[in-house]
Amino acid sequence: MLMIHSVANGLNHFCTWVMRLAYLNVLWILFSLAGLVVFGLMPATAAMFTVAREWAKGNTDAPVFSVFFRTFKKEWRASQILGLIVVTAALFLFADMRIAAQMDQPVLVNVFVSISLIFAFVVLYVFPVFSHFDVKIREVLSISFFIAFSRPAVTLLMAAGAVGVLCLVLFHVTFLLFFSGSLLSLILTKLSFKAFRSMDQRQEKEKAA
């Protein structure tokens, strides 16, 4: 009986998380589409990571829609600026890589591939940092860069998690519709949380001193 009860509890816990993630992902997609993607994707992503942050803190009973909608409105402008910077940088890197490849410059291609890899590692932290720290956009980028390379093990785990989610999305469209963004945001937030806590503790010590 005890074993059956344990299995039932585990199954219930699993189903609860599946529903949470699916609901959050649907909100992310709907709000992105409501803003015609261009005007909705970044604030919806910021809102999704804010909900994931609440879950990572253990606040699993947080009102998902209220937190999501409040963040979407509050961070609309800042998240758009942040997204514009990230997307513009990514497009520049992609264009430079294509030009170098067309000019048959393997050394330059390798340089841009290396820069793109560094950029990708930093981007993994951008929205977790944005949702966790109350700082300016410039500081979001500098903190993301600092943590990405001061915590290489965490960064590699985050990259592996992102690749894993991508594989699931490519496996079946169901994962795209219900888990692509929400699962990724939860993985990245949970993994980055330890680094954030150490930074928070350091800031508290500096303030106390």
Swiss-Prot record:
Transmembrane helix among keywords: yes
Any Pfam family hit: DUF624
Gene: yesL
Membrane topology per record: Multi-pass membrane protein
Organism: Bacillus subtilis (strain 168)
Keywords, in A-Z order: Cell membrane, Membrane, Transmembrane, Transmembrane helix
Segments passing through the bilayer: 21-41, 81-101, 107-127, 159-179
Protein name: Uncharacterized protein YesL
Subcellular location: Cell membrane
One GO cellular component term: plasma membrane
